[in-house]
Amino acid sequence: MTERFNDRLADVIRRPLITEKATSALEQNQYTFEVDHRAAKPDIKAAVEQLFDVRVVGISTMNPPRRSRRVGRFTGKRAQVKKAIVRLAEGNTIQLFPES
């Protein structure tokens, strides 16, 4: 784990991503999260294991380039987004949707 997130692992994971592709990946025990763009794989693994009390088997990350956005005559850039697909060990699950 890098020194950047030693004392605040909760800052590594921003939110779970709920898309059609991410929802279908839940069947293979893979969860998709938006993470801090400076986070490395050991940071993400430590954060998921500590916050959700599960065992992580593998992590895939993607850091796509920022895209330009235009509103009227003004142009800008979208926020930097890094996604992580976390594969859990068999028998481990993360409760993303609360039971009612």
Curated annotation (Swiss-Prot):
One GO cellular component term of this record is:
ribosome
Family matches, as SUPFAM superfamilies: Ribosomal proteins S24e, L23 and L15e (SSF54189)
What biological-process terms (Gene Ontology) are attached? translation
Q: Which GO terms describe its molecular function?
A: rRNA binding; structural constituent of ribosome
Q: Keyword RNA-binding: yes or no?
A: yes
**Database matches in Pfam families:** Ribosomal_L23
Top-level taxon of origin: Bacteria
Signal peptide (from-to)? none
Alphabetical UniProt keywords: Ribonucleoprotein, Ribosomal protein, RNA-binding, rRNA-binding
Per the record, the similarity remark reads: Belongs to the universal ribosomal protein uL23 family.
Function, in words:
One of the early assembly proteins it binds 23S rRNA. One of the proteins that surrounds the polypeptide exit tunnel on the outside of the ribosome. Forms the main docking site for trigger factor binding to the ribosome.
NCBIfam families (alphabetical): PRK05738.2-4, PRK05738.3-1, PRK05738.3-2, PRK05738.3-4
Q: How does it assemble?
A: Part of the 50S ribosomal subunit. Contacts protein L29, and trigger factor when it is bound to the ribosome.
- Report what the protein is called: Large ribosomal subunit protein uL23
